[in-house]
Amino acid sequence: SLAYIIFFCWKLDMTKRMQWLWRIVIAMLITCLISISAIALQPGNAAISPLPDPYLTTGKLAEGEKVFKDYLKNNDKDDKARFGLGVIQFMSGTERLMQSLYRYGMIQNPAGGSIPFFRLPVPTNPKPQTLTYDGLQQVFQGWIDDLATVRTTLEPIKDQNLKLALRLGLIRLDFDGNGKADDKEMLWQLFNAVTGARVTEKDAQQFLIAFDRGDALWLQGYTHVLGAMGEFLRAYDSRELFAACAHLFFQNVDTPHKFLLIRPKKTDEYYFNIFDPLDLVTAVHLAKFPLVEPQRMTTILNHMKSVISLSRESWKSILAETDSDREWVPNPKQLSVIPQVRVTDEMVKSWLKFLDEIALILDGKKNIPFWRDEKLSINFAKIFTEPRPFDLVSWVQGTAATPYLEKGNTTDARVWNEMVNAFGSNLFGFVVWFN
């Protein structure tokens, strides 16, 4: 017993007594440390929550994803770690998409400016693989699957006090798939390439965002936005368009029209390929796709409904905030990390009305105006619940809308006018930001 040991030590001379006492103290400390370690390692006990920054800023996304998954196995209620994993997974999915586009030699073509997938600043690949139609569809499906993974991770988050500080601009992605993410593959460089901005590395280091639960819902909503786009590309068969126009966006494509792969040499910085306008006209003409997977159209409708639901929930969370801490999407009483941008009460009120109006349209309870007859309107929801082959020219002309025309309740123009008045000339930018 401890009393016996102390009595034994006390019978010794002073020098030996101190030596024995030190041995006893050290032995007790070691025993305590072993016991504490054993308890900490037992399943269900708290551990130190990992942070995503060390993995995001070094480009070690796969390692980070494994660390977070292992941690969450025994700490699944840690919403901060869950949010961190969701961010890592979103960045991993973006990285995989860019690597796929690089592998097939994507070309930076202004014609692809309206297609989000083709706006990514993918480096030029000196030895690209040949892209087939099925190969491109696999790229789109991989992106859809990655977004679904992020959604599954983010959905359980409930902590209203959640806070995750990140320097987004310093995140590194391995664009070209060479196994390392260098300085040229940082997000602030990508932002400059996509937007034409002049952000410096110093700016990126100072751009610290404190993401909260409202932002977690915001990101979850964006996985639905991007997922809907991917589902549309998979719902229709666009092989004919691919064969005639894929060369506009990729260096080597599997096409029966081999002459399309012969590219005139650029003579100067003002070079203009006279065949590009002809190819674009052809692209419009061939934007006529058979419907091959109609169930994906229903999925698109569900994605859009989820965007509305999550935006409502996000704004409920944002409006409940009382702090003002490096906000990504602020309420009217907070300051945003985005310079010289303020959110007003009028903006929020008009946005929430807009969400209600869009929800009615997606439920088929309100229609959108028909541009060729003001007495008729289009049941927008039916386009997805009763899908048909897609024909761009026929939609512009109006005949493609015929199966969906009704004398129904049309959307309230006042809601849309309020939006324009509240947001002004920056309406589109705010819509993209607010989600």
Predicted feature locations:
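N-terminal secretory signal peptides that target proteins for export/translocation
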Residues: S1-L21
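Bacterial N-terminal signal peptides
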Residues: I24-S37
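Boundary at the C-terminal end of the N-terminal hydrophobic targeting segment
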Residues: A38-A40, A46
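Short coil/linker segments at helix-helix boundaries
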Residues: I48-P50, Y55-K66, F90-E418, F428
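Residue-level recognition of tetratricopeptide repeat
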Residues: D78-D79
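Alpha-solenoid helical repeat scaffolds
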Residues: F83-G84
